[in-house]
Amino acid sequence: MRVSADTMGPFFTVAASAPAVIAFISVQKEEHMSDQVAAPLDAAAASDAAFARISSQPFPQDIFAAPQLRWAVIGCGVIANQMAQVMALAGRPLAGVANRTIEKARAFAERYGVERVYESYDELYADPSIDAVYITTPHNTHITYLRQALAAGKHVLCEKSITLNSAELDEARALAHEHGVVLMDATTILHMPLYQELVRRMNTGEFGQMNLAQVNFGSFKEYGDLTNRFYNPKLAGGAMLDIGVYALSIARLFMASQPKELVSLANRSTTGVDQTSGFVTRNAEGQLGVFSLSLHSKQPKRAMISFDNCYIEATDYPRADHATIVWTNDGRREEVRAGEEGYALAYEIADLEAAVAGDADKLKLLDYAADVMETMTRLRYEWGVYYPEEAELAAAAGVEAAGA
């Protein structure tokens, strides 16, 4: 749908949490919204293609190095199916599944050879044979399952975005510490071997000083009614939690510290969630990040990380297994490959198991996730995007929570 100037609301200056932070928002007033639910995710089709490429190959023996844990999954959606596929391919089928609808859980278990279907979530948590839980439900439900699973002494791998806001993540981290278990964010970027290799090389000083990250992510999702999760505030819709987490995560991996200063513009949909945004970040070391996100405008998924001696370009970066380094002195292009897109979810399982075994580098991944969550939370609040679960915070800020 095209938006003309007279359908745009005014711009507002939003008070910032620090003097250097400025934010503006405009509220987009659509005449109507289509009743068509969003088309299937491009990412899902890409993942299917990646899985097809690996399904006839022997599973790599070097992915899983730590002692094996017994896993159960909460939820039976697209990402849960992808995880079940790759684990079955690895010869490590999931040990259990729980879902709000028991019939879906039974069908899921039959499809992937899952050992046990739980009649309730409490039954799963009480099963001493389950070591770790993978949470795949909508963003706004994560904190409930995190509280329950962590308190039950289960290690947890939780899909992105791991929580609604930084306060919830702080609570979950405290629970994990209290109960002596590992909590891990399942944002794929944190686990892909490609980025681990590039960060390793960066840390040797080979690339020189990191100066700037430029990251785009734009999808085209049809406007729909509130059953469309992308625009539904009651399902924590909006671009930031759905795709912004990828953009911020890849930049954070290469930056010395999290951003302190933010300057941003955002448009909200009529449902009140963030639809399109552009923002610039700067950390204490002076490293800049320039980002653009959209749920209603297609953009290439492209990340460019610039250093003194080179820049790195990664396309389709959420599960990338290759990138290009362009060297400043002679323009030489170096192709770097590591890992395989189709094994993205296996790397997540492997990283949690390694963290449980005491791998300090894997344990540190949650620190990156916490930095990203803090930035996402600050930006959303500066744009006036609060979810129903954040109604009290919205009232204190003098705005109404989306979907309230």
Model-identified regions with their sequence ranges:
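Predominantly a Rossmann-like dinucleotide-binding segment in NAD(P)-dependent oxidoreductases
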Residues: 189-262
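Hydrophobic residues in well-ordered beta-strands that form the structural core
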Residues: 158, 183-185, 314
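N-terminal Rossmann-like dinucleotide-binding module
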Residues: 34-112
